[in-house]
């Protein structure tokens, strides 16, 4: 593969950062998602540097929200090969120094090269180990590996679930994560620091809500699935998230939006769930909140980010044709006869 010139290396990381900055929840559901195609292309050209690039995207404030949505998508998709997007391509590292190139890319994009979240050391180590392990373990041989893809799917989902749980635990103290913000004495610097702190806090809380909502939805859809790989993944989620009776016992019930609709089994009561838009607050909105909060009396923190929610019935479009007896293999057979493309299964190209 050889070493990449700085210009090309910066372009690759530029594409990754920009994609995660604009990543929308549910990109994996789209057959021709530009975001997924771009990430697949970057992955195919950066070799063993892929986990280091993902790690930087996880902890940088500009790409953090999008990266976590990407991980949530992989953890809750029916595309059993989507986890291969975490695997590296080839056995060479074309970068001389990934972190240095990442810093140069931030400057090229007009981003601060020191706006990195400060996760607890234990999670930082765990996240790095997770991404390095997936770099190797998420690879699938396109000739022989497809035959046991369901087994690999279960193992990968278990690993991703543990990563999300570790993130959830590490992000309980949002103030700790924003401790990197150290403004100077100028008015603009103080305001910008407050804006960034408000933005990071909002995004971390949003990610925590998305995790609990989407994990719960996956469990409700697949814990009784007749397809063993979906059922096993759902059962492992139940164990990891201490779910009892369809509600995460140790986790708050999050606010919901169009992308975050919780889905539970039909019950006698199906109240309406409020809807919103899955978009982070824009800078102007955050700026107004910060300036307003200066004059407002301080309030005690609420007991938790909890909002009552109803129990909506299962939506028909949430049910997959693959959640039927032998549905998955029938689906593969039918699609193969119709010139089936493995990318539609969520299998990222490995070469």
Curated annotation (Swiss-Prot):
Q: What segment(s) does the record annotate as region Disordered?
A: 246-330
Mark out the compositionally biased spans (Basic and acidic residues). Answer: 285-298
* Major localization class: virion
Q: What are the TM regions of this chain, as residue ranges? A: none
Q: Which UniProt keywords apply?
A: Capsid protein, Host cytoplasm, Outer capsid protein, Virion
Feature: compositional bias, Acidic residues: 315-324
What would be one Gene Ontology cellular-component term for the protein?
viral outer capsid
Q: Where does it localize?
A: Virion; Host cytoplasm
Q: Describe the family membership recorded for this protein in Swiss-Prot or TrEMBL.
A: Belongs to the phytoreovirus minor outer capsid protein P9 family.
Write out the function statement from the record: Minor outer capsid protein.
The identity of this protein, by name, is Minor outer capsid protein P9
């Amino acid at each position: 593969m050889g070493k990449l010139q700085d210009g090309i290396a910066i372009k690759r990381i530029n594409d990754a950062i920009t994609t995660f900055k604009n990543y929308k929840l549910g990109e994996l559901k789209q057959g021709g998602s530009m975001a997924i195609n771009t990430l697949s292309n970057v992955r195919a050209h950066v070799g063993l540097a892929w986990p280091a690039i993902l790690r930087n995207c996880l902890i940088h404030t500009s790409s953090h929200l999008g990266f976590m949505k990407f991980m949530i998508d992989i953890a809750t998709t029916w595309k059993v090969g989507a986890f291969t997007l975490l695997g590296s391509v080839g056995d060479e590292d074309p970068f001389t120094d990934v972190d240095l190139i990442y810093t140069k890319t931030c400057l090229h994009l007009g981003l601060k090269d020191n706006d990195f979240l400060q996760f607890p050391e234990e999670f930082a180590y765990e996240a790095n180990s997770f991404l390095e392990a997936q770099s190797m373990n998420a690879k699938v041989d396109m000739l022989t590996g497809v035959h046991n893809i369901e087994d690999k799917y279960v193992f990968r989902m278990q690993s991703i679930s543990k990563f999300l749980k570790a993130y959830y635990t590490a992000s309980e103290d949002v103030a700790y994560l924003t401790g990197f913000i150290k403004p100077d004495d100028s008015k603009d610097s103080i305001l910008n620091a407050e804006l960034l702190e408000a933005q990071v806090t909002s995004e971390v809380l949003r990610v925590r809500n998305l995790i609990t909502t989407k994990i719960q939805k996956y469990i409700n859809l697949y814990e009784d699935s007749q397809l063993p790989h979906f059922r096993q993944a759902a059962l492992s989620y139940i164990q990891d998230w201490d779910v009892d009776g369809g509600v995460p016992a140790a986790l708050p019930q999050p606010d919901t939006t169009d992308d975050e609709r919780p889905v539970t089994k039909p019950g006698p009561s199906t109240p309406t769930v409020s809807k919103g838009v899955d978009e982070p607050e824009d800078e102007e909105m955050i700026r107004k909140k910060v300036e307003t909060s200066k004059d407002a009396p301080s309030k005690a923190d609420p007991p938790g980010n909890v909002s009552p929610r109803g129990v909506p019935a299962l939506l028909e479009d949430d049910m997959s044709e693959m959640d039927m007896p032998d549905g998955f293999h029938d689906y593969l057979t039918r699609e193969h006869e119709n010139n089936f493309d493995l990318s539609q299964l969520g299998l990222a190209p490995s070469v």
